[in-house]
């Protein structure tokens, strides 16, 4: 009989070509990764965090080796045992027996198959497992929380640090045993240990014993998994969205079921081991059937019966204890316990005149007019200087001392904007060696603008009043002065595709970088990676696929390449364990321009705490407008434990510990020692610019919307819940963002910088609460929640917006403005005022319908409701608008300053108070003038439709006269 043929062998030439192809493919696959690792290694050395890079790399590598070796070794051992126990003689069933052919092939390349398969499986397993380096390091460096869960009385640290590691180990043991079972089974089959004949198969003793041991081990691991499943119940999602954590069914049905299934799994494993001696596989088969049946009946059907027939008919009573646990745990996990939150009953109706309340006078004086989400085009038009400079799409709000008083400012760094380069500016030399940095820090006091004219169509006022610190300008306010205003790192700079610049002196050549029209500059900072040697130049040329880096004469022995210029990216690289806030903002700290970034530590599986996701909680109208990408990161514990700074000139990254109690941060400080500086090293000037982060606040306000409720029954019905109001200034239903405001402290009347948000009733529009959090050093992170009565009739943001825009004065003038302008409603601020009342303030911006136009403040709208109804103020200034509600109260507001020269945009050196306005026109005069405007517009439309040019011209003249008459009325 002719023996089965093996696989055909390759010729020598074919083998050489195959080897070359494999090497080339490996280089293409691995080469860019190696280059990236090398340039990253250089970068981490530049910023002083190379220990982070090596620690992460080493942890990944060790994890890759350990898991790869363990999984590969178990598979190899299973194959080896099966091969060594093969029958001595294996009869061939016929000339076409396929197994015989495979057996011959394997025997001819025994070492190849015996090594390649386990090695390949091990490598693949290691590559997958190394991504879990965080789990390993947190297990090795975990810290106690000092809080225990209410069910097992275990420290929360067990659930956040230990349990994920045990699950990780258990999962890979499952994978290893399952792969070993398959490998052992296939090997026995190929070498005759298992024969399939007719409807039944036969096993050799060795095959039966080995497979029974492996299967028994697998079931034994399942028993261990059932034990750990009990702890995983502490983050059960069965009762979501009502609450997170185990409810009545989980505790009284699922938890006992896990112990029952554990016992059955142990019995099943023993049955497999017993089959080694009984030589009867029917017993373990019956045990497996029992385990499967029990999993269905005990693990699923019984809990379902309890849930449907015992819990649901009495849910409020049955779940009461577990809702209490959820409330307490969620408050702890999100930092909204009674230690941090002060609840204050607030009537919602004013009881005094604002001018009689010192704190209200401070609030009115600091009412913010400038909206940082609208004014970027205005900053660009008036303070850009050069086409290659730019400002971010959304500006920032911060506070500084001005004339001894705390004031809030809209601030921005004037950054390099590589995407704005045009013409020859985009040449590689110019783009990467000439236009390398931004110039200046620009601030505008948020409660001041140049004088707005009574004529809303006039475009000479309503602009920010700037304080600029750059290479040619020094601000009067020393707190805004930057010693070195050049910025090599920033949000705008990093938005270009290849965000790198090459700096440093070249022997024999003068400065190359653009500084001003009359001077050039050579970078002298510590930032940047040296590319003075050819090896580094080659690495970066390959990284950016740019040959000019190799051959350009603009690069010398002292040259450095600056890359990774986004402040947030730099922080995320040196602290990969942090989740960063969406807003990085510039601040002048000790004479330097610093980017400040908030960092969050998070954890999953906090027992009974509500599970959340950033993308589900923090997105608001601003995020929708800017298209910001929010990470889909789930967590049930969060702390703002780290404040990071990035120097705008040299890129130095510094991490500061601001929460000394956070066990997650302590764990990471154990993983990466000496990377986070203690709180004591934060300077007073830096502390003065710390803001409570917006993303953290948005997460906490969502939690407070539910978890301010103490009573489980009330919690279950949702009756007392709040909601984040939708932003009334846009057309979508996106959440209203929180706003930074300066308000008067109720005790001292001093200006207090706070982050605020109104809250409306659940599925209602009336105001239910007002949440604010302090930003000053003494009270940082302390919440104040003003709770309105449940029967309140205080208008919410949507209602206030509707009331203001439907006012006859507002509606008529806005309709007129829209004829030739784009109208934008600015941030609708909610301000507690008048000892119990709520004042809404909203700037109205206009922008002409022309290519180079930009927004300017046109009007200010205010709204206040009390027992006498809703009162609306509408005027060019805050002072006038508030005085329309409370005569004389607006005198506390900051007066506007004269408009700048329209040609230069420069502000006057000495602010002056505008002359007193003429007495306002009577309402009858205004009504008549508006009626004439409307009538003239109707006549114009009729003449246009008729096609009569004579009538059209007359109607146009009539409309112009009507508009002039309306605008001439004193306001």
From Swiss-Prot:
Keywords: Cell membrane, Membrane, Transmembrane, Transmembrane helix. It is a multi-pass membrane protein. It comes from the Bacteria. The chain crosses the membrane at residues 16-36, 61-81, 112-132, 172-192, 209-229, 257-277, 286-306. It holds the Pfam family UPF0182. Residues 890-927 are annotated as: Disordered. This is UPF0182 protein RER_22310. It comes from Rhodococcus erythropolis (strain PR4 / NBRC 100887). The lineage of its organism: Bacteria, Bacillati, Actinomycetota, Actinomycetes, Mycobacteriales.
């Amino acid at each position: 009989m002719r023996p089965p043929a093996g696989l055909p062998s390759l010729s020598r030439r074919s083998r050489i070509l195959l080897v070359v192809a494999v090497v080339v493919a490996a280089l293409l696959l691995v080469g860019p990764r190696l280059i990236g690792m090398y340039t990253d290694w250089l970068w981490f050395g530049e910023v002083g965090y190379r220990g982070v890079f090596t620690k992460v790399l080493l942890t990944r590598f060790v994890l890759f080796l350990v898991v790869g070796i363990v999984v590969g070794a178990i598979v190899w051992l299973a194959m080896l045992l099966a091969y060594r126990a093969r029958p001595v003689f294996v009869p061939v069933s016929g000339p076409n027996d396929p197994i015989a052919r495979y057996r011959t092939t394997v025997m001819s390349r025994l070492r190849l198959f015996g090594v390649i398969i386990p090695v390949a499986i091990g490598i693949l397993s290691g590559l997958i497992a190394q991504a879990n380096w965080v789990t390993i390091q947190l297990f090795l460096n975990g810290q106690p929380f000092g809080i225990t869960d209410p069910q097992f009385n275990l420290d929360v640290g067990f659930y956040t640090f230990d349990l994920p590691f045990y699950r990780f180990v258990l999962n890979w043991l499952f994978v290893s045993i399952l792969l070993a079972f398959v490998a052992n089974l296939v090997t026995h089959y190929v070498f005759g240990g298992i024969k399939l004949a007719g409807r039944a198969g036969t096993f050799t003793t060795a095959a039966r014993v080995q497979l029974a041991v492996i299967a028994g081990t697998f079931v034994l691991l399942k028993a261990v998994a059932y034990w750990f499943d009990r702890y995983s119940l502490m983050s059960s999602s069965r009762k979501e969205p009502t609450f997170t954590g185990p409810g009545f069914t989980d505790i009284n049905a699922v938890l006992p079921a896990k112990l029952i299934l554990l016992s059955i799994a142990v019995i099943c494993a023993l049955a497999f081991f017993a089959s080694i001696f009984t030589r009867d596989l029917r017993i373990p088969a019956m045990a497996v059937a029992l385990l499967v049946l029990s999993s269905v009946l005990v693990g699923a059907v019984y809990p379902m019966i309890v849930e449907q027939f015992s819990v649901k008919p009495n849910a409020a009573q049955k779940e009461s204890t577990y809702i209490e646990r959820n409330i307490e745990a969620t408050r702890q996990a999100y930092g909204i316990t009674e230690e941090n939150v002060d609840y204050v009953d607030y009537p919602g109706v004013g009881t005094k005149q604002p001018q009689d309340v010192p704190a209200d006078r401070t609030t009115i004086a600091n009412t913010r007019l400038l909206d940082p989400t609208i004014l970027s085009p205005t900053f660009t038009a008036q303070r850009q200087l050069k086409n290659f400079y730019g400002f971010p799409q959304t500006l920032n709000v911060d506070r500084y001392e001005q004339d001894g008083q705390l004031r809030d400012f809209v601030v921005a760094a004037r950054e390099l904007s590589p995407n704005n380069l045009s013409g020859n500016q985009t040449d590689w030399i110019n783009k990467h060696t000439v236009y390398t940095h931004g110039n200046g820090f620009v601030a505008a006091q948020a409660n001041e603008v140049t004088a707005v004219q009574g004529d809303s169509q006039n475009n000479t006022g309503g602009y920010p009043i700037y304080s600029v610190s750059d290479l040619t300008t020094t601000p009067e306010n020393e707190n805004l002065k930057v010693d070195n205003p050049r910025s090599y790192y920033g949000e705008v700079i990093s938005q270009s595709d290849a965000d790198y610049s090459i700096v440093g002196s070249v022997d024999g050549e003068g400065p190359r970088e653009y500084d001003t029209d009359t001077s050039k500059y050579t970078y002298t900072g510590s930032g940047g990676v040296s590319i003075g040697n050819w090896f580094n130049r080659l690495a970066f040329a390959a990284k950016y696929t740019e040959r000019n880096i190799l051959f350009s004469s603009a690069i010398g022995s002292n040259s450095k390449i600056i890359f990774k210029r986004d402040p947030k990216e730099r922080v995320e690289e040196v602290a990969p364990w942090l989740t960063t806030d969406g807003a990085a903002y510039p601040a002048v700290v000790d004479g330097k321009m610093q980017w400040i970034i908030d960092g969050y530590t998070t954890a999953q599986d906090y027992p009974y705490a509500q599970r959340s996701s950033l993308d589900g909680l923090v997105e608001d109208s601003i995020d929708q407008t800017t298209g910001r990408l929010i990470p889909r990161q789930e967590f049930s514990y969060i702390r703002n434990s780290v404040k990071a700074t990035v120097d705008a000139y040299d890129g130095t990254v510094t991490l500061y510990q601001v929460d000394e109690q956070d066990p997650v941060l302590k764990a990471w400080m154990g993983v990466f020692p000496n990377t986070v500086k203690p709180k004591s090293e934060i300077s007073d000037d830096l502390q003065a610019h710390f803001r409570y982060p917006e993303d953290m606040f948005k997460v906490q306000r969502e939690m407070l919307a539910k978890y301010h409720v103490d009573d489980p029954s009330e919690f279950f019905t949702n009756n007392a819940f709040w909601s984040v109001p939708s932003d009334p200034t846009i057309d979508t239903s996106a959440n209203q963002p929180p706003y930074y405001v300066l308000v008067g402290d109720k005790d001292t009347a001093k200006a207090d910088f706070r982050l605020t948000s109104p809250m409306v009733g659940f599925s209602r529009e009336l105001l239910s609460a007002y949440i604010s959090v302090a930003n000053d050093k003494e009270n940082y992170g302390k919440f104040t929640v003003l709770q309105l009565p449940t029967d309140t009739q205080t208008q919410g943001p949507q209602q206030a917006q509707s009331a203001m825009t439907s006012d006859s004065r507002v509606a008529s003038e806005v309709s007129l403005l829209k004829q030739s302008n784009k109208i934008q409603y600015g941030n609708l601020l909610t301000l507690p005022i008048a000892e119990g009342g709520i004042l809404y303030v909203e700037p109205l911006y206009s922008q002409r319908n022309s290519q180079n136009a930009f927004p300017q403040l046109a009007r200010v709208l205010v709204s206040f409701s009390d027992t006498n109804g809703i009162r609306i103020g509408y005027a060019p200034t805050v002072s006038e608008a508030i005085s329309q509600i409370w005569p004389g109260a607006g005198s506390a507001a900051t007066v506007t300053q004269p408009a700048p020269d329209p040609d230069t945009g420069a502000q006057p050196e000495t602010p002056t108070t505008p002359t007193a306005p003429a007495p306002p026109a009577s309402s009858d005069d205004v009504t008549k003038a508006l009626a004439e405007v409307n009538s003239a517009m109707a006549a114009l439309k009729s003449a246009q439709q008729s096609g009569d040019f004579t009538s059209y011209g007359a109607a146009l003249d009539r409309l112009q006269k009507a508009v002039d008459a309306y605008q001439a009325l004193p306001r």
